């Protein structure tokens, strides 16, 4: 009988303890939830007393601000300068630009606006526009200079050397193009209109007729180049006499007679 009473007493005490513990736990949960709802700022769905907001509303962006050794979350409608917005289904975040002197960026490595007095060129910030680029008139952005409009290159011409197409093995060939439009009409700012490259062909002898024409042309050019040399030559005199012919003595006239050997009678 006593044993039965002891068992009943133990069961009743255990039930009382279990009910009391559940009540205490429920009260503690309600107290934490109430404190959390009071500490979270407007637009924050989940927050912590130590780290601030942990999750913002869907239309807001969470920004982690450093406070000593902690990072505190803040909900903002847009990201501040030096940050770009990264949207994802879980939560929108503000991520800091990693480009030096950048005020606004499209991604962590592509700037869209530099700090004051700096020039923007291909997603980077510079104190001056790089070589080969110029600043726009009303912005601090560097761009390529106005380009000339050029025609297509012509086919490569035949391989030649000194305007000859034969008698050589190594020569050159060229191709050309035209300027269709130049900014301000200044063609000097445009690219080259002629290109030349070396070429090698199988050596072929020039035709005989071409050689003769070249030789005759060379003689005519020499004659035209040195006309005094031809006039300086004196005509050959008829002073050459046949062997044995006697010249007339001064003061005598008449034909010359041959002087032959005299034979004794």
Swiss-Prot record:
Expressed in the dorsal part of the neural tube on 10 and 12 dpc, especially in the boundary region between roof plate and neuroepithelium. This expression is enhanced in the rostral part. Also expressed in other tissues such as truncal region neighboring forelimbs and mesenchymal tissues around the nasal cavity. InterPro entries: Furin_repeat, Growth_fac_rcpt_cys_sf, R-spondin, Rspo_Fu-CRD_dom, TSP1_rpt, TSP1_rpt_sf. Residues 147-207 form the TSP type-1 domain. Its main location: secreted. GO terms for cellular component: extracellular space; nucleus. The keyword Methyltransferase does not apply. Residues 245-257 have a biased composition (Low complexity). Residues 1-20 form the signal peptide. Interacts with ZNRF3; promoting indirect interaction between ZNRF3 and LGR4 and membrane clearance of ZNRF3. Identified in a complex composed of RNF43, LGR5 and RSPO1. Interacts with the extracellular domain of FZD8 and LRP6. It however does not form a ternary complex with FZD8 and LRP6. Interacts with WNT1. Binds heparin. Interacts with LGR4, LGR5 and LGR6. Interacts (via FU repeats) with KREM1. This is R-spondin-1. It comes from Mus musculus.
């Amino acid at each position: 009988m006593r044993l039965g009473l002891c068992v009943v007493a133990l069961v009743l005490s255990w039930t009382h303890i279990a009910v009391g513990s559940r009540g205490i736990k429920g009260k503690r949960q309600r107290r934490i939830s109430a404190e959390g709802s009071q500490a979270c700022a407007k637009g924050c769905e989940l927050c912590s007393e130590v780290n601030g907001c942990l999750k913002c509303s869907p239309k807001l962006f969470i920004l982690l601000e450093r406070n000593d050794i902690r990072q505190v979350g803040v909900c903002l409608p847009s990201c501040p300068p030096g940050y770009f917005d990264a949207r994802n289904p879980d939560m929108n975040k503000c991520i800091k630009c990693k480009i030096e002197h950048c005020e606004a960026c499209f991604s962590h490595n592509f700037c869209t606006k530099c700090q004051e007095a700096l020039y923007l060129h291909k997603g980077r910030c510079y104190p001056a526009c790089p070589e080969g680029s110029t600043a726009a008139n009303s912005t601090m952005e560097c761009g390529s200079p106005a380009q000339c409009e050029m025609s297509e290159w012509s086919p490569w011409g035949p391989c030649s050397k000194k305007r000859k197409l034969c008698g050589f093995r190594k020569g050159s060939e060229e191709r050309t193009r035209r300027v269709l439009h130049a900014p301000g009409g200044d063609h000097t700012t445009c690219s080259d209109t002629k290109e030349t490259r070396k070429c090698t062909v199988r050596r072929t002898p020039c035709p005989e007729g071409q050689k003769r024409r070249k030789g005759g042309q060379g003689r005519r050019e020499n004659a035209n180049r040195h006309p005094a040399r031809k006039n300086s030559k004196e005509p050959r005199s008829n002073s050459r006499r046949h062997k044995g012919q006697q010249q007339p003595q001064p003061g005598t006239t008449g034909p010359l007679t041959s002087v032959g050997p005299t034979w004794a009678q």
